[in-house]
């Protein structure tokens, strides 16, 4: 009979270190989401956390590595969740995926994080929108963290639209991600244009509409909505 082996407890010092790193990442995420990579210094982050800036150099070496760590922390979560959702959707629908079904697995799963995850996830959403719209250095980060899940979506869309050209499917995805990034940026523009009828941080309203709207666009450009 096997005895239950308990995992060794982390030392208090290790716990404090992990907690400090999380505080640094949270503070950096907030500041980067508001001011961008070039509008924030390590001293700014250190001041918000209440530590000396040399501690940030010790843990992350420089600002770029801190930024990459901030971005990667939640990128892993959203990428894995969407990949699992796409896998589960394909398993459930067999050989008959629909455009809207694939888009809901991809988009709704991501939007749920911003609906349920509080302000921290909304900060990450704004940060992601910045990264996606900064080709000089953001494209590489997006490629590294999100290409696998995006290509998984593309694969399902090809199965849902077997007569659609690859060109139209990739353009369709371009329009999807453009709308998603603008939504994640929460610029407040729709608030002003609609005189308060719509709120840019109302991710529930976005979730109710985005996948079906984008699915109709795919069907149209692929000749099935004409």
PLM regions with names:
Residues 1-7, 116, 147-226:
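C-terminal peripheral helix-coil segments that are non-catalytic and often amphipathic
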Residues 66-87:
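Histidine- and aromatic-rich ligand-binding microenvironments
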Residues 25, 79, 100-107, 173, ...:
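Short, amphipathic alpha-helical "lid/cap" segments that border enzyme active or binding sites
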Residues 23, 31-73:
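Helix-turn-helix
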Residues 101, 105, 116-144, 187-192:
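Amphipathic alpha-helical segments used for helix-helix packing
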Residues 17, 21-29:
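Short, leucine-enriched amphipathic alpha-helices that occur as contiguous helical runs
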Residues 83-122, 173:
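Hydrophobic alpha-helical connector segments
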Residues 106, 110, 125-132, 176, ...:
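Short alpha-helical scaffolding segments that buttress acidic/His motifs in well-ordered protein cores
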């Amino acid at each position: 009979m096997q005895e239950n082996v308990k995992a060794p407890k982390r030392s208090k010092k290790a716990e404090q270190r992990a907690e400090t790193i999380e505080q640094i990442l949270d503070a950096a995420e907030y500041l980067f989401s508001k001011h961008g990579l070039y509008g924030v210094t390590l001293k700014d982050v250190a001041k918000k956390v209440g530590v000396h800036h040399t501690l940030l150099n010790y843990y992350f070496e420089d600002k770029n590595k801190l930024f990459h760590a901030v971005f990667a922390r939640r990128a892993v979560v959203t990428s894995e969740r969407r990949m699992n959702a796409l896998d589960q959707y394909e398993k459930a629908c067999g050989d008959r995926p629909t455009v809207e079904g694939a888009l809901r697995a991809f988009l709704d799963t991501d939007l749920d994080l911003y609906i349920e995850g509080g302000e921290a996830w909304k900060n990450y959403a704004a940060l992601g929108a910045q990264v996606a719209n900064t080709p000089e250095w953001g494209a590489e980060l997006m490629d590294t963290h999100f290409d696998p899940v995006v290509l998984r979506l593309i694969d399902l869309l090809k199965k849902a639209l077997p007569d659609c050209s690859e060109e139209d499917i990739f353009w369709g995805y371009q329009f999807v991600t453009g709308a998603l990034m603008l939504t994640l940026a929460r610029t407040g523009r729709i608030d002003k244009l609609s005189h308060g009828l719509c709120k840019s941080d109302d991710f529930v309203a976005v979730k109710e509409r985005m996948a079906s709207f984008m699915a109709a666009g795919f069907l149209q450009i692929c000749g099935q909505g004409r």
